[in-house]
Every structure is written in C-alpha cells, then in structure tokens.
Design a protein with these regions (language model features):
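Generic signature of intrinsically disordered, low-complexity, basic-rich segments
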Residues: 1, 6, 34-38, 88, ...
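Short alpha-helix boundary/capping and kink motifs at helix termini
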Residues: 16-71, 83
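Feature 3881 marks metal-assisted phosphotransfer/nuclease machinery
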Residues: 113
Length: 113
C-alpha cells in the first residue's frame, strides 16, 4: 500500500490558503507516504500544469492536517515519483487545521511590494 487512502476530493472545508506565497510561509517537513490520504484519484495534466501547481512552483507537496489525518492537497506527482523510486517519505508543507477547518497558525501575509 502506497497511501493510507485514495479519495476523489478533499473532506475538509476550504481553508483559504490557496496561493504559492501563502504556502511558502510554512516550513517543509518529512511526511510518510503511508500516512497520506490523497484528495484526487487521478493525475490530471491540466492540474499539473496550472500556475499554482507544485510542478512549476513549490518544490514541496502541500499537505493538510485535519481531524487526525494528513491529506495530500497538491504534489501527487511528487508522491508517486517517490513511491516509484522506492522511497517511503516526501517533504511537504503541512497546514494544520482546527476542528472547524480554520488554519491553527495562519501563515503571515505576503510582504507588500
């Protein structure tokens, strides 16, 4: 088993952390693949090539921690590549949500130009 579970969507409420600059405020850490629940069952090239995708921007997967589970929000391609290479972990930015789905420690706002 590569992942803990495979889902078609995210079960948690919209958290509002959507832009690359917001995610970059969260320090990356190692996450075990077998602890991740995916939020999509397929790898769609349109999503992969989107401007806010981790394919072009962030080097780290985006993971949401909610109600005791870790959900792989973006970076499915990175997780699959790691599994194919025989690795059991990836580095990801983990956004912690409270019970209601709000970030427990909201990332600071991006600097103004």
């Amino acid at each position: 088993v590569i992942f803990k579970a495979v889902r078609e969507n995210a079960p948690y409420p919209e958290h509002g952390v959507t832009h690359q600059r917001d995610w970059s405020a969260i320090a990356p850490r190692q996450v075990r693949l077998d602890q991740l629940v995916t939020t999509r069952a397929t790898l769609d090239l349109r999503d992969l090539l989107d401007e806010d995708s981790t394919f072009f921007g962030d080097l780290f997967a985006h993971v949401v921690s909610w109600r005791g589970d870790l959900y792989l929000e973006t970076g499915l391609h990175r997780a699959l590549r790691a599994a194919l290479q025989g690795r059991t972990t990836i580095h990801g930015r983990v956004l912690e949500l409270d019970e209601t789905g709000h970030p427990t420690a909201a990332p600071p706002p991006p600097p103004r130009p």
